[in-house]
């Protein structure tokens, strides 16, 4: 079934109807023989095996093979998860370890997603954009080309509470560290948001804003450009 990911109610419906999963990885010390079981992937030989499968299937397998197992260790990183993580194998971008990117996210060429960044369902990351460490792009957030979302910044999502207008960050925008862009706010191209700002209303192109709530303090000038330069080499 197709869902309209521009509509928060459709996203909620998708999450509601998605099959919830609790995948496990299990290390087993024991003699499992050929180690065949429905819906479980088993790798190993002799007395060591690694199992992959859903929690209920794994539990049943471990119980039925209890007399052959000396000990086991379970790794689990989610419970009743509705949305899988994105398949990164075909994305032409730099994605560092520890980034969490949910499925149904668009990531442009040469984008950079740093450690600890979180990108939620329906988001669009433009070509050459950088999502820095521990930054959050909420549901349906739109990040322009070569934009920089600073460490710890939050681009608010529009899933709960539901809103039809997502945050939109224009091309070549720099969002300073630990800034918050509230739901539905649009930031014009080439603007700069000072670190720690809370932006509650739209920002035009080519200005610098700062404060809580954020206010325009000046237009972007040569001095500002020098301090907020986007480095292409980081996107190669």
Swiss-Prot record:
Pfam assignment, any one: Hexapep
Reaction catalyzed: (S)-2,3,4,5-tetrahydrodipicolinate + acetyl-CoA + H2O = L-2-acetamido-6-oxoheptanedioate + CoA
Pathway involvement of the protein, from the record: Amino-acid biosynthesis; L-lysine biosynthesis via DAP pathway; LL-2,6-diaminopimelate from (S)-tetrahydrodipicolinate (acetylase route): step 1/3
Positions in coiled-coil regions: none
EC number(s) per entry: 2.3.1.89
One annotated GO biological process: lysine biosynthetic process via diaminopimelate
Primary enzyme class: transferase
Keywords: Acyltransferase, Amino-acid biosynthesis, Diaminopimelate biosynthesis, Lysine biosynthesis, Repeat, Transferase
InterPro entries registered for this protein in UniProt: DapH, DapH_N, Hexapep, Hexapep_transf_CS, Trans_hexapeptide_repeat, Trimer_LpxA-like_sf
Entry GO MF terms: tetrahydrodipicolinate N-acetyltransferase activity
Entry function: Catalyzes the transfer of an acetyl group from acetyl-CoA to tetrahydrodipicolinate.
PANTHER family the record matches: 2,3,4,5-TETRAHYDROPYRIDINE-2,6-DICARBOXYLATE N-ACETYLTRANSFERASE, ACETYLTRANSFERASE
Family according to the record: Belongs to the transferase hexapeptide repeat family. DapH subfamily.
Protein name according to UniProt: 2,3,4,5-tetrahydropyridine-2,6-dicarboxylate N-acetyltransferase
Originating organism: Clostridium acetobutylicum (strain ATCC 824 / DSM 792 / JCM 1419 / IAM 19013 / LMG 5710 / NBRC 13948 / NRRL B-527 / VKM B-1787 / 2291 / W)
């Amino acid at each position: 079934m197709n869902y309209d990911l521009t509509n928060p109610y459709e996203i909620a419906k998708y999450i509601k109807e998605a099959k919830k999963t609790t995948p496990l990885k299990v290390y087993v010390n024991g003699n499992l023989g050929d180690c065949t079981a429905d819906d479980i992937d088993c790798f190993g030989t002799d007395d060591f095996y690694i199992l992959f499968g859903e929690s209920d299937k794994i539990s049943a397998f471990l119980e039925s093979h209890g007399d052959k197992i000396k000990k086991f260790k379970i790794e689990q990183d989610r419970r009743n998860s509705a949305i899988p993580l994105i398949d990164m194998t075909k994305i032409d971008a730099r994605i560092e370890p520890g980034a969490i990117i949910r499925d149904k996210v668009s990531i442009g060429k040469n984008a950079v997603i740093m450690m600890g960044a979180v990108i939620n369902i329906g988001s669009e990351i433009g070509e050459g954009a950088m999502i820095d460490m521990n930054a959050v792009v909420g549901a349906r957030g739109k990040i322009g080309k070569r934009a920089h979302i600073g460490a710890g910044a939050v681009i608010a999502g529009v899933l709960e509470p539901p809103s039809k207008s997502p945050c939109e960050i224009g091309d070549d925008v720099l969002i300073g560290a630990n800034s918050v862009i509230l739901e539905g706010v649009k930031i014009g191209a080439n603007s700069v948001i000072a670190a720690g700002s809370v932006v509650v209303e739209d920002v035009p192109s080519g200005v610098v804003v700062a404060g809580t709530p954020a206010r325009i303090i000046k237009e972007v000038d040569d001095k500002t450009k020098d301090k907020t330069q986007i480095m292409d080499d980081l996107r190669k």
